[in-house]
Structures are given as C-alpha cells and as structure tokens.
C-alpha cells in the first residue's frame, strides 16, 4: 500500500542523537497518557466496550457486510483511508479506523501494523513492539513492517530503555534486507546501528548502500555526524 511509504517511523531523524550510546541513567520517563474516548484507544484499550460503542461497532460491521462483496474488500477500503489519516497525523481518527478494521478481521495485518505505528508515535514503545510483532507473526514477508519494528527497538536503545538492543535491531534489519535488498530506510538504520557500535567504516558502507537504493532517503544530518567520526572512504560526502 503506497501510504505506508510515508509513515512517520521512516522519517525519524538521527540528528538528536549525537552520542554513540545512551548515557548511564538516561532512560526516558514513561509518557503521560492522555484520557481518550475508548474508540480512540488502540484496540479500545483492551477493555470491554460501552453499550453505545458496541452498538456503533455492530452497526458498522453490519453496514460493511451489506455494502461490500466481502470482509476482505471492506478491510482493504478502510485500511487505505486509515493509512491516509496516519500520514496526516490524525492519529485519533486513524486509531478508530484501524479498530473498526480489527472488528471486521481480527487477524488484519494492516490493523496491527497501523496501530503499532500509532502507538510508537504516541510514545508507547512496548505496545508498539507487541502490535508490530503480532503483525509479523501473521505475515513475516512484510519487510517494511519489519523495518518499522526495528526502528521502534532502535528508539528504545537510543532512549536507554530495555525494550530494544542493537543486536536485536541488526537482526531485524538484516532479515528485512534479505527480503528487500533495495530498502533504503533499512540500510540507513543499519548504518546507524554500526555507528552506535563505533564501526564507522561499516556505517559508511551501509550509508552508501542507502544512497544507491534511494538517495532521497539519506539522513544527511546523520551523515554529518558520521563524517565527523571518519571521512567518507568514497570521498562523496565532505
């Protein structure tokens, strides 16, 4: 789906992370969760629905069954709209749509993927990891979702949280690139992992792999940080 290509996870900048590893005791504080209506919470907050919400959900499912040739057709239609809401940062509306999709198909990969992305954007990395992992269990061929999963774990490492390590991130990125060798975003993140491991020559190798795959996805802020540690062996970036 084209809208997945503009996910905000893919736009995480490396510029804010000038250290090679998180400072001791620098773990980020847990985000304060705002109060939202149940329909705007991921999977309704995993709580029983109110009578009003359940009635609305039942009517939605019945309407889809009457209007579409199949549940799969309805899921595809609403997933496209939901990803558009993600792309325009309308996260509450996107959450509601993905919740509805989950009601149509409890095993919808789009629902778990989309809600995982939303959870990450809301600062709940643990929930994002659980949702994205479930999506990958349902369809392990989704290399772009695997990169999103790796990005969340990399964010955990960068924030000094226990939900991700560099080795875990590297494993997921290597897997994603085996599925799609031209995934520039995966090469960029792999370059960042090598940077954190202080293997700057390898970081440059991966950086140039990203350049060849899609120059528009290069993080030039990160490139400047890498260049400060070691000049570009190819002499392209100075």
Question: Where do the model's predicted regions map?
Answer:
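Conserved positions within tetratricopeptide repeat
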Residues: 95, 129, 163, 170, ...
């Amino acid at each position: 789906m084209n809208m997945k290509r503009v996910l905000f996870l893919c736009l995480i900048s490396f510029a804010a992370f000038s250290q090679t590893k998180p400072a001791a005791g620098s773990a980020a504080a847990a985000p304060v969760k705002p109060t939202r209506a149940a329909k705007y919470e991921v999977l309704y907050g995993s709580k029983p629905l109110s009578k009003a919400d359940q009635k609305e959900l039942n009517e939605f499912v019945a309407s889809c069954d009457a209007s579409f040739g199949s549940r799969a057709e309805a899921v595809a239609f609403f997933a496209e709209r939901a990803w558009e809401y993600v792309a325009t940062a309308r996260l509450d509306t996107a959450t509601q749509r993905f919740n509805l999709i989950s009601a149509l198909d409890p095993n919808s990969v789009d629902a778990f993927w989309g809600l995982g992305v939303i959870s990450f954007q809301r600062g709940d990395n643990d929930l994002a990891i659980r949702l994205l992992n479930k999506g990958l269990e349902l369809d392990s061929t989704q290399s772009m979702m695997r990169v999103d999963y790796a990005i969340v774990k990399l964010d955990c490492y960068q924030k000094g949280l226990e939900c991700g390590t560099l080795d875990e991130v590297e494993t997921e990125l290597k897997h994603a690139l085996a599925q799609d060798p031209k995934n520039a975003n995966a090469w960029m993140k792999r370059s960042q992992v090598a940077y954190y491991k202080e293997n700057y020559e390898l970081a440059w190798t991966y950086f140039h792999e990203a350049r060849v795959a899609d120059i528009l996805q290069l993080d030039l802020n990160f490139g400047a940080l890498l260049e400060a540690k070691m000049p570009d062996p190819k002499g392209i970036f100075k």
